[in-house]
Design a protein with these regions (language model features):
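A conserved short beta-strand
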Residues: 33-55, 66-79
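Gly/Ser-rich "nucleophile elbow"/oxyanion-hole loop immediately N-terminal to the catalytic nucleophile
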Residues: 1-17, 21, 32, 62-66
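Catalytic histidine neighborhood in serine/cysteine hydrolases
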Residues: 119-153
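Short beta-strand/loop motif that positions the catalytic acidic residue
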Residues: 92, 98-100
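Catalytic active-site module of serine/aspartate enzymes centered on a nucleophile-bearing elbow/loop
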Residues: 143-200
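Hydrolases whose catalytic domains are alpha/beta-hydrolase-1, hotdog thioesterase
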Residues: 22-26
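Acidic catalytic loop of the alpha/beta-hydrolase fold
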Residues: 82-83, 103-107, 134-135
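Short alpha-helix in the alpha/beta-hydrolase fold that links the catalytic acid
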Residues: 94, 108-119, 141
Length: 200
């Protein structure tokens, strides 16, 4: 629906956790399932990463990993990036801003965000958040959610989720403005075949 209005090369993508894989694929990365299978042999207890045993499960058979040339920058938060070595990341030629918590117990920082920051062909801006866990990037919980989902809602002592989110918003705005240029009103793409209305 929004595709015809996207300015080519001016699209910024934000990916969190497994969404980081999606953002990387859209920006030119090629999934390498052999890497995931090898990782799961080394760390079989990582149930979240290895529950499919290195098999890529698509919602529909026609879905295939494909880059989108309109993507001009990516912001990744606690990205799951086990699928990508240097060769698989060679096609990612856009600026990247990466955040991860140094106390992430769900997505191993050393094999994901940290390794990704070393391997991307365009050196990213990599920021490690002291004391933060995997779920610090999720919305602040209300009282009921804190009781029902404590693992998702409780942060370590000294970690202020609201403050982190405010910082992320400011830093993301600066990053995307620098990477993509100042925001401009998007017009319907001529490639969509729809005529543009003339202003009078």
């Amino acid at each position: 629906m929004l595709g015809p209005y996207l300015n080519g090369g001016k699209v910024g993508v934000i990916g969190y956790s497994a969404g980081g894989e999606t953002a990387l694929i859209l920006s030119g990365a090629r999934p390498d399932l052999d890497r995931l299978r090898k990782y799961c042999l080394e760390r079989p207890n990582d149930a979240d990463a290895c529950k499919t045993h290195g098999v890529l499960i698509a919602d529909r058979s026609e879905l295939v990993p494909e880059a989108d040339q309109r993507v001009g920058a990516v912001m990744l938060m606690a990205p799951l990036s086990l699928l990508f070595g240097r060769h698989a990341l060679a096609g990612v030629q856009v600026p990247a801003l990466i955040y991860s918590g140094d106390s992430d117990q769900l997505v191993a920082v050393d094999r994901n965000a940290e390794a990704l920051a070393r391997k991307l062909p365009v050196t990213p801006d990599y920021r490690l958040l002291a004391g933060a866990g995997h779920f610090v990037f999720m919305a602040h919980c209300d009282a009921e959610q804190s009781v029902r989902m404590p693992a998702l809602c409780k942060d370590a002592a000294g970690v202020d989720r609201r403050h982190i989110h405010h910082s992320l918003q400011r830093e993301a705005a600066v990053f995307f403005s620098q990477a993509l240029g100042a925001p401009q009103p998007a017009e319907r793409s001529a490639a969509s075949g729809a005529p543009r209305q003339q202003q009078r």
